[in-house]
């Protein structure tokens, strides 16, 4: 499937809200609050000492939980009500339905009795939390769909639930993801069909949120003109560009001017692909820093790689 173009947003400038004001960047090594063992961002229980934990995203730290809560100098935090589906973020007692900001950004999800789809949802929600942490690192505004028209939201749907095709894409702030792509065999089949070098859920999210931020960050004519100088005129027909891309492919020597073959299709996709690959690179460097990998700047044996 191909990605839908996003609709051009209005000229209303949006401002950041509390959900994007995070503390230390995620590159700081996450550790168990009890035994200080390195843990992963999706950890619910420390594999070393058994401490139940949750992430307090404002200060970007894991804290120990007792009976699903923790109390400190900044008050009491509670486990997100979606913890049974893998969410380890914490909330205040006034959080709507006890759900964290990441879970509340999901506008549409499978029905509660669709347990198979909900298992897929848990994997996609994990990737979404990683995305939001990274967006917070960059200081980008996160304005929810339920507070502002055109705000950020996610429709997480499964094409396996009712047989209807789900088109991955972005429109007016809402990012749509097909939960079926959380299955490795489904995602790999699509990757091979489209001739892509790799295909991941987190990659989809990073790409589609690039469409969202193109509208959020570029508001005035001068900035749009600079954007068009770099990426091309986004007012060109998307449908014609889509048809041409899948008929003839990327131009020769595309590597000289574009980050990926898909970026050659249309200026919208060039921006979104560039945004996504920037997040790929930053995420790789953050992971390297967290686990202690060091690069030798003087090494001469490094070769060009496909990022």
Task: Give the ranges of each region predicted by the language model.
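N-terminal low-structure segments adjacent to metalloprotease catalytic domains
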Residues: 17-143, 147, 300, 307
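Active-site recognition of the HExxH zinc-binding catalytic motif
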Residues: 199-219, 272
């Amino acid at each position: 499937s191909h990605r839908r173009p996003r609709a051009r947003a209005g000229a209303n400038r949006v401002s950041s809200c509390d959900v994007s004001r995070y503390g230390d960047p995620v590159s700081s090594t996450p550790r168990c609050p009890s035994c200080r063992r390195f843990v992963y961002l999706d950890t619910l229980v420390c594999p070393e000492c058994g401490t139940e934990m949750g992430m307090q995203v404002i200060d970007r730290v894991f804290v120990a939980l007792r009976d699903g809560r923790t109390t400190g100098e900044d008050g009491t935090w509670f486990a997100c009500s979606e913890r049974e589906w893998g969410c380890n973020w914490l909330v205040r007692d006034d959080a709507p339905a006890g759900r964290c900001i990441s879970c509340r950004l999901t506008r549409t999800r499978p029905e509660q009795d669709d347990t198979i789809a909900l298992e897929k949802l848990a994997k996609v929600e994990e990737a979404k939390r990683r995305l939001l942490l990274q967006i917070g690192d960059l200081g980008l505004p996160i304005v929810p769909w339920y507070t502002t028209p055109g705000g950020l939201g996610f429709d997480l749907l499964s094409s396996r639930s009712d047989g209807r095709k789900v088109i991955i894409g972005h429109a007016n702030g809402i990012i749509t993801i097909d939960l079926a792509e959380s299955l490795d065999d489904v995602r790999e089949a699509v990757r091979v069909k489209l001739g892509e070098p790799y295909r991941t859920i987190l990659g989809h999210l990073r790409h589609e949120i690039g469409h969202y931020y193109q509208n959020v960050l570029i508001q005035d004519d001068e900035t749009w003109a600079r954007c068009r100088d770099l990426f091309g005129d986004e007012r060109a027909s998307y449908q014609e560009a889509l048809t041409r891309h899948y008929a003839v492919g990327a131009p020769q020597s595309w590597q000289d001017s574009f980050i990926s073959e898909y970026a050659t299709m249309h200026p919208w996709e060039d921006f979104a692909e560039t945004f996504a690959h920037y997040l790929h690179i930053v995420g790789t460097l953050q992971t390297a820093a967290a686990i202690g990998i060091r690069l030798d700047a003087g090494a001469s044996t490094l070769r060009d790689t496909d990022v």
